[in-house]
Amino acid sequence: DAGSSEGVYWEPSRGQIDAEKLEGFDAIVHLAGENIAGKRWSTKQKRRIRDSRVSSTELLVKTVSGLANPPNVLVSASAIGFYGDRGDETLDDEASPSDETFLSRTAQEWEQATDLLQDSNVRLVKTRFGIVLSPQGGALKELLRPFNFCLGGKVGNGRQYWSWVTIDDVVQSLMFCLQNNAISGPVNVVSPNACTNLEFVKALGSVLRRPTILPLPGFVARTVLGEMAEELLLHSTRVVPNKLLEHGYQFRDPVLTDALSILLGRSGKNHD
């Protein structure tokens, strides 16, 4: 039952889920998905990235829609890749997507997989995550690698916008969305202060006290990482978290240099 400490068995690739154990839950948060930066994007890997998101969401939503006692709210992950490569255009929660990139198409399908619940009594929240910064790994770990060898610098021309958010704000914003019945639909989970790639690497270099004078040319990134470099490093997505702010969410880490200092243990502060 919903009060049990046991896990709920499911295997999305086979369309299997223990539906009975989902009865009576107050809320479900769905964050499953293959790491988009885990491997170079072969055709097979892109299929895994897409299917791990879309197929699992379709299975969960179909199951929830058939429950006798469904949850009050379902929070389903998405990503700001939904918007595509948009230059310096400011993108709020209601901005239209681009269908020109793999990540945008994937995110659109990912969100469309929740459509079955649109007219139900389940409150549906689609959290579009930005670049998540965590001391445990992920994007920040990869971004630190060149700095460890004093090779840090901008990627491409450095003018592309990176919309970032700390792991603490991810967790807190998820809790905020779960507890606030007025929030539904797409929610941008990003810091209110997006920055350019050049600004990001300069902030990181400042915190690490390392130089940022060795750029990574775009053509080199594309040669090494292919399409993945284009979409993850060189595309520009300037996103604002209007819905969170309008509903009163207060970011714990709104300023990049302060956030990096805390994450990298350089500030003497930490979050409880």
Q: What are the residue ranges of the model-derived segments?
A:
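NAD(P)H-binding glycine-rich loop region in Rossmannoid oxidoreductase-like domains
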Residues: 2-59
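Catalytic helix-loop patch of NAD(P)-dependent Rossmann-fold dehydrogenases
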Residues: 51, 55, 87-126
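Conserved Rossmann-fold NAD(P)-dependent oxidoreductase catalytic core, especially the SDR/UDP-sugar
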Residues: 58-101
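Glycine/proline-rich active-site loop of Rossmann-fold NAD(P)-dependent oxidoreductases
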Residues: 108, 120, 133-142, 177-187
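NAD(P)-dependent short-chain dehydrogenase/reductase
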Residues: 115-126, 130-162, 204
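Alpha-helical substrate-binding/gating segment
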Residues: 144-152, 160-195
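Mid/C-terminal beta-alpha module of Rossmann-like enzyme folds, strongest
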Residues: 180-227, 261-272
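C-terminal amphipathic/interface module of NAD(P)-dependent oxidoreductases
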Residues: 231-272
